[in-house]
């Protein structure tokens, strides 16, 4: 087992699991953060196994926390290069768990928050085989050089008061996805800053439960 494969997870209520949900945290946090959402959603997603990997790097601007890529230089082309260099490590984590659970991309849901949304959307767009669906909270889209996957439905959720990543990034992402004819939806939540609330979780649950496998 490689060093990235130790992280919190929650088994599905119904066995064997039919879906793998991968929770991707924001910068400076770790997998223990988003796994805390599972008690609020698992009853509505009884056939889902949840994992919440830790970012693959130590957070480089504080003496604690993890990151998926550095934010010391926030130029989009630099971020895209850093993600491209690191994405295979996240894919390894997901593939390992898929193999263990006898699941594949078509059974896999990506849920990201903030930086987790950025890498989650990138991951989604480069897949050779489509994922079941992807949900991004309070994030942005940094597109890859080449888009391989235009079939995974995407749900974007963003607080209108977000001062960390402006809600305009949701609209930028939506415009990009529209140009590629990628099925997606966007939800601006009133009176919400850089956070996930009950409204967003309800949207996410409904999205997962209404998506259908892509053959």
Curated annotation (Swiss-Prot):
<dbReference type="InterPro" id="IPR029058">
    <property type="entry name" value="AB_hydrolase_fold"/>
</dbReference>
<feature type="active site" description="Charge relay system">
    <location>
        <position position="114"/>
    </location>
</feature>
<keyword id="KW-0378">Hydrolase</keyword>
<dbReference type="InterPro" id="IPR003140">
    <property type="entry name" value="PLipase/COase/thioEstase"/>
</dbReference>
<dbReference type="GO" id="GO:0016787">
    <property type="term" value="F:hydrolase activity"/>
</dbReference>
<feature type="active site" description="Charge relay system">
    <location>
        <position position="194"/>
    </location>
</feature>
<feature type="active site" description="Charge relay system">
    <location>
        <position position="162"/>
    </location>
</feature>
<dbReference type="Pfam" id="PF02230">
    <property type="entry name" value="Abhydrolase_2"/>
</dbReference>
<dbReference type="InterPro" id="IPR050565">
    <property type="entry name" value="LYPA1-2/EST-like"/>
</dbReference>
<comment type="similarity">
    <text>Belongs to the AB hydrolase superfamily. AB hydrolase 2 family.</text>
</comment>
<protein>
    <recommendedName>
        <fullName>Uncharacterized hydrolase RP744</fullName>
        <ecNumber>3.1.-.-</ecNumber>
    </recommendedName>
</protein>
């Amino acid at each position: 087992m490689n060093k990235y494969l130790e992280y919190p997870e929650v088994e599905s209520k119904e066995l064997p699991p039919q879906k793998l949900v991968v929770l991707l945290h924001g910068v400076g946090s770790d997998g223990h953060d988003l796994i805390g959402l599972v008690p609020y959603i698992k009853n509505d997603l009884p056939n889902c196994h949840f994992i919440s990997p830790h970012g693959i790097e130590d957070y480089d601007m504080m003496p604690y926390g993890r990151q998926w890529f550095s934010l010391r230089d926030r130029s989009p082309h630099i971020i895209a290069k850093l993600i491209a260099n690191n994405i295979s490590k996240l894919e390894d984590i997901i593939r390992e768990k898929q193999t263990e659970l006898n699941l594949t991309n078509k059974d896999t849901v990506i849920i990201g928050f903030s930086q987790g949304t950025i890498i989650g959307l990138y991951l989604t767009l480069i897949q050779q085989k489509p994922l079941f669906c992807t949900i991004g909270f309070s994030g942005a889209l940094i597109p890859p050089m080449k888009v391989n996957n235009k079939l995974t439905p995407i749900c974007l959720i963003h607080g209108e008061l977000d001062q960390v990543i402006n809600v305009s990034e949701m609209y930028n992402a939506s415009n990009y996805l529209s140009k590629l004819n990628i099925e997606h939806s966007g939800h601006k939540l009133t009176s919400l800053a850089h956070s996930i609330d009950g409204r967003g979780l309800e949207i996410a649950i409904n999205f997962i439960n209404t998506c259908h496998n892509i053959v």
